Amino acid sequence: MSPLRARMIEDMTLAGLAEGTRKIYIQAVRRLAAHYRRSPDELSEEEVRRYLLGLRQRGVARGTFKTGQYGLRFLYRHTLGRDWLLFGEKKDRLATAQAAA
């Protein structure tokens, strides 16, 4: 097991993600790495964007696409600490709740 995969599994465990979710997220990362034949930590935001666009264009089921996207978002945001625009902005839940009150 690669150090990156081990770290992601640890991060998902700390985040309290279910075993099934962890497996799906790891599978999404594995598919991305296989597509480019490189470690995901070596990929640019544009490369990940093109990969996701290709999934959409091939007609991957919406649920499959979204869970894969969430898995990649977890990897890049939580494990690698990259806050890419590709995955949208993080919302400050407290500020949102206070603004709604």
What is each residue range found by the language model?
Residues 6-98:
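N-terminal core-binding DNA-recognition domain of tyrosine recombinases/integrases
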Residues 1-2:
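Intrinsically disordered, low-complexity and often Lys/Arg-enriched segments
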